């Protein structure tokens, strides 16, 4: 058999796969409708593992890993579709935000970062020694917002500010870039409410993956499936019973977009912990 003949047979098989895939997605839509009504969970890892074990039981070892990967991928695509349909059928995204940027009269920031304060009178800025004190002033309503250097583009991110935002109910709503002695730095403003404006093009999130093989790859593949670009990613180890990592990701998108809402909905349901750290506009 020639290569051309083999390719023709592959084309026939691909058309059959396409037809079966379309049929399967019709069924996935029916599943989404039922689960939206019953509020049943879309992702059931134990059930998926049982199905994979059953389907791969009679598959030759030489192609078992490849078939397993295919089945997992089909399940991932089906779940993605179901999350989007569920939001269309039932408004169940539990994320509260406002659509107007708050007015800021008083700020809190680190004393050694006071030089990056722009647009505010310095006599209205409360300077402290660490970010926990900044967070405390905001919580007590003694200031309207906090400000800090989020990232030195030449060197890296501020782990302390990332961690402070991750551990508190505070959100970035503005990001400005300043030039300091030849170094470009991202300076963020953050407050009590998640603010989402139409012009925002960045969404900052933090999550912890489920502690199993391939979990991070699955999340990154999920984000890619929504056609969303990552503009920054880094991890920070922490001890929560056993060692794990918090992953901080900046997405190119806006929470007002349906696709981004579906992605967030899926991440909430398929990661160990998840939090939005902010929504803002960024030129870079």
Task: Report residues per predicted region.
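Domain-level signature for soluble enzymes in the chorismate/prephenate branch of the shikimate pathway
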Residues: 1-284
């Amino acid at each position: 058999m020639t290569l051309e003949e083999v390719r023709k047979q592959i084309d026939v098989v691909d058309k059959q796969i396409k037809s079966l895939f379309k049929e399967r997605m019709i069924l996935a839509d029916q599943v989404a409708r039922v689960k939206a009504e019953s509020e049943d969970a879309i992702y059931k890892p134990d059930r998926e593992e049982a199905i994979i074990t059953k389907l791969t039981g009679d598959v030759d070892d030489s192609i078992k890993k490849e078939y397993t990967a295919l089945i997992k991928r089909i399940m991932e695509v089906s779940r993605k579709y179901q999350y989007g349909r569920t939001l269309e059928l039932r408004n169940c995204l539990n994320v509260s935000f406002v659509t107007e940027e708050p007015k800021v009269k008083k700020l809190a920031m680190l004393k050694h970062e006071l030089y990056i304060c722009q647009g505010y009178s310095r006599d209205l800025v409360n300077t402290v020694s660490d970010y926990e004190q900044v967070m405390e002033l905001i919580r007590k309503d003694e200031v309207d917002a906090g400000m800090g250097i989020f990232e030195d583009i030449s060197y890296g991110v501020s782990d302390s500010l990332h961690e402070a935002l991750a551990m508190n109910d505070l959100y970035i709503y503005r990001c400005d870039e300043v030039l300091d002695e030849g170094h470009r730095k991202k300076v963020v403003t953050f407050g009590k409410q998640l603010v989402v404006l139409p012009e925002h093009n960045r969404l900052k999130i933090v999550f912890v993956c489920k502690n199993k093989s391939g979990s991070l790859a699955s999340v990154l593949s999920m984000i890619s499936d929504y056609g969303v670009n990552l503009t920054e990613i880094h991890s920070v180890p922490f001890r929560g019973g056993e060692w794990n990592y918090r992953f901080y990701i900046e997405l190119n998108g806006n929470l007002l977009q349906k696709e981004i809402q579906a992605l967030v909905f899926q991440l909430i349901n398929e990661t160990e912990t998840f939090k939005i750290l902010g929504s803002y506009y960024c030129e870079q």
